[in-house]
C-alpha cells in the first residue's frame, strides 16, 4: 500500500510541475519597446535609466541587424 501511495504522490508532483512550467511558458505579460530608435548609438547608462524611470523595466543595447548601430530595447510588464 505504501508503494502505491508513493507512486501516486510522484505522479501528482509530476503533474503539478508540468502545469507550472506551462503557465510560465504562456508568458508573464511582458512587452518590449525601442527607446529613441533614431538615436545614432545606444548609451547603456542612459538606456537603462530611461527604461527604469519611464517603464519600470529592464533595458539593453541590441543591434537589429549585423553592422547596424544598437538600439535601446526596454522590456517591461504590460
From Swiss-Prot:
Family: Belongs to the DEFL family.
Alphabetical keyword list: Antimicrobial, Disulfide bond, Fungicide, Plant defense, Secreted, Signal
Classification of source organism: Eukaryota, Viridiplantae, Streptophyta, Embryophyta, Tracheophyta
Record protein name field: Putative defensin-like protein 154
Keyword Secreted: yes
Source organism superkingdom: Eukaryota
Compartments it resides in: Secreted
Biological process per Gene Ontology, one example term: killing of cells of another organism
Amino acid at each position: 500500500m505504501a508503494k502505491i501511495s508513493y507512486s501516486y504522490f510522484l505522479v501528482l508532483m509530476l503533474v503539478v510541475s508540468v502545469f507550472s512550467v506551462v503557465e510560465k511558458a504562456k508568458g508573464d505579460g511582458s512587452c518590449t519597446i525601442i527607446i529613441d530608435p533614431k538615436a545614432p548609438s545606444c548609451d547603456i547608462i542612459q538606456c537603462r535609466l530611461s527604461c527604469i524611470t519611464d517603464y519600470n523595466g529592464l533595458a539593453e543595447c541590441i543591434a537589429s541587424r549585423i553592422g547596424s548601430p544598437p538600439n535601446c530595447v526596454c522590456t517591461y510588464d504590460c
